[in-house]
Design a protein with these regions (language model features):
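Membrane-lumen/periplasm interface segments of specific transmembrane helices
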Residues: 19, 195-238, 242-258, 288-297, ...
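Extracytosolic helix-loop segments that constitute the early lumenal/periplasmic catalytic or substrate-binding loops
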Residues: 21, 35-60, 67, 74, ...
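Transmembrane-helix motifs of polytopic, lipid-linked glycan transferases
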Residues: 85-108, 146
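Hydrophobic/aromatic-rich transmembrane helices and adjacent perimembrane loops
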Residues: 91, 137-140, 178, 305-317, ...
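Transmembrane-helix signature of polytopic, membrane-embedded enzymes
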Residues: 101-123, 141-142, 157-161, 223, ...
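Membrane-interface alpha helices of multi-pass inner-membrane proteins
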Residues: 117-118, 145, 150, 159-174, ...
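Short acidic/glycine- and proline-prone juxtamembrane loop motifs at membrane-interface regions
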Residues: 129-139
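Extracytoplasmic
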Residues: 175, 394-567
Length: 567
């Protein structure tokens, strides 16, 4: 098993590094949000600074503490690509998280189990898509993983270092708390109330630093941090993001988690045979909820929203069973075993709720995936050999499946990257227009170090929840304050082309030929309709500035530059 684990870990790490080698230095934004973070890194040492006054130009919302922007600003000086410094931080942070996961699992289950878990992490979709992007999530996760590892040691100096790592994790991304809470709950279970001094001291220091940030920013940090947590939740979209890739990306891990939670013949266990039987029945119920997803994966004939809902029901069953193991679980030691694994799963599933917030994505599954891998890895060293072998095989399948499927992700194909590179046409056209320029695409300005006047996503969400009415921006548009405006629309396919016999026409690439509907605005990050009308009443399209980007064969994005109408 050791040699197999080494091979799988080598495959996973090599694949991740090869992807990073291609994409870390890529000069264009790969996913929305990178350019906003790039602008934050610029504003560390430039006007208007981080946390500008809300309700005034520039309409920007800085959701997180300043640690990552400062670090990205420093590292970015050594990169020739706009995003290279920030992506390098994220790449190294993701690799560090995998190493720490390996070391944590190694303590209880051996190096082979640790390597399997580390390899599984690097081949999970959320890390393949977000583990190297210029976003705060990978750094926050790596700091939290350092904290978890340090808390496993008894030495005071090591635990102080771990508390510092947790501190910076939270002040990199405020919602990175699941690993922190599980770690201190485990410490409390092992050492009793004396262990509470660690989380309470960390809380006190965190609140003091929060007060310091509020003081030095005249309250702006508080307003920005609170505002970002008031955005609407869209549960249907959240279910889609969380569970549409369950089959085949996460199914082996899901089964492995159940096998890890089902009790074995541990010392002190109450009616172990009955508990095991009940556990397998509950696992069967949860897997039964997911059967529709398996059928949909093999023969896509039903509405994906339906099987996403059933997968959600399966996770509700898992949540209930994990809660039951917390209330009932016993083990040879107070801090390890099934009970703390139940806590890990409850925290993992609770952390997944944030993916329902509008604009959230798979990066909100980072902690959930890590906690599930910790459960599986810990069980390998605890349960009977036959079940430990099955869990190991499931992790190996998870690695091999992710290794194969990652090559099918369309956003990283060469032709997709070539499409992205064409964005330079918009940036080149903007060179003749002086600041200020308004853009619905942050990359059009941030990549050349030009200031953003507005964060499209946060501005739209603030408008939708009634915290910004847009009247000040409309007044600026009426006064033609901006020398140019970059507008963005999208176009989705409306149906498939058919021949005279009613058969779907298949192109040379083997895919059906689509026909497209009209150009529309993005409901999440396009400017509100009344602001769009103000643009059209005061600006006109600049000839020759249209740029259409094919995201997929069935989805297009278009950009245009508009200039003031002569008066």
């Amino acid at each position: 098993m050791f040699l197999v684990a080494v091979l799988l870990a080598s495959l996973a790490a090599s694949q991740f590094l090869m992807r990073c080698w291609t994409l870390v230095g890529f000069p264009q934004e790969i996913r929305y949000g990178e350019a906003v973070v790039l602008d934050q890194a610029r504003r560390v040492m430039a006007e208007p600074g981080l946390y500008p006054e809300m309700g005034k130009e520039p309409w920007l919302l800085d959701q997180y503490a300043p640690f990552y922007p400062f670090l990205a600003h420093i590292v970015g000086k050594f990169s020739s690509s706009p995003y290279g410094g920030g992506r390098a931080i994220s790449m190294l942070a993701t690799l560090l998280s995998a190493v720490m996961l390996t070391l944590i699992v190694r303590r209880s289950s051996g190096i082979a189990a640790g390597l399997l878990c580390g390899a599984a992490m690097l081949t999970m979709m959320e890390f393949l898509r977000f583990g190297f992007l210029m976003r705060v999530d990978p750094l926050a996760l790596s700091l939290a993983m350092i904290g978890v590892w340090c808390n496993l040691h008894q030495k005071t100096s090591v635990r102080i270092f771990g508390a510092a790592a947790f501190f910076f994790a939270v002040y990199t991304r405020q919602t990175t708390v699941a690993l922190l809470l599980v770690s201190y709950i485990q410490m409390w279970r092992q050492e009793g109330r004396v262990a509470l001094r660690w989380p309470l001291s960390l809380l006190a220091v965190g609140l003091l630093f929060y007060g310091f940030l509020v003081l030095v920013t005249d309250g702006a940090f508080h307003h920005h941090a609170v505002m970002s947590n008031l955005f609407h939740f869209e549960w249907a979209e959240g279910l889609k993001k969380a569970f549409s890739s369950f089959m085949p990306w996460r199914a082996p891990l899901f089964i492995g988690v159940f096998l890890a939670l089902i009790p074995g013949p541990e010392p002190g266990a109450i009616r172990p045979r009955r508990a095991r039987t009940a556990g397998f029945l509950v696992m069967g119920l949860a897997l039964g909820c997911c059967v529709q997803a398996l059928i949909q994966f093999a023969v896509p004939i039903s509405d994906p929203a339906v099987h996403n809902k059933w997968i959600c029901y399966g996770h509700v069953v898992l949540f209930a069973y994990a809660t039951w193991t917390i209330l009932r679980g016993t083990s040879a030691t107070r801090g390890d075993g099934i009970r703390i694994d139940g806590v890990r799963i409850v925290m993992a599933l609770a952390s997944m709720i944030l993916i329902g917030r509008i604009g959230s994505d798979l990066n909100y599954l980072f902690e959930a995936g890590i906690l599930m891998l910790l459960v599986c890895g810990g069980a390998i060293g605890r349960v009977a050999p036959p079940r430990a072998l099955i869990i190991s095989l499931l992790l190996a399948i998870q690695v091999l499946g992710g290794f194969y499927l990652s090559g099918l992700q369309l956003e990283f194909q060469p032709e997709r990257l070539l499409e992205m590179k064409e964005r330079h046409r918009i940036i080149d056209h903007l060179e003749v227009y002086p600041d200020p320029v308004l853009s619905e695409e942050p990359w059009a300005l941030a990549q050349t170090g030009r200031p953003l006047m507005l964060g499209p996503y946060t501005a739209r969400q603030m408008y939708d929840i009634g915290l910004w009415d847009g009247k000040d921006l409309i007044a600026a548009l009426d006064a033609q304050r901006y020398s140019a405006i970059v507008r963005a629309k999208q176009r989705s396919y409306a149906g498939l082309e058919h021949d005279v016999n009613g058969n779907v026409i298949i192109a040379a690439d083997g895919l059906p030929i689509p026909y497209f509907g009209p150009w529309t605005f993005n409901s999440v990050r396009s400017l509100p309709l009344e602001i769009q009308q103000a643009i059209e009443g005061n600006y006109q399209q600049a000839p020759g500035t249209t740029m259409i980007e094919r995201v997929t064969k069935y989805y297009l994005e278009g950009r245009e530059i508009w200039v003031p109408i002569p008066r």
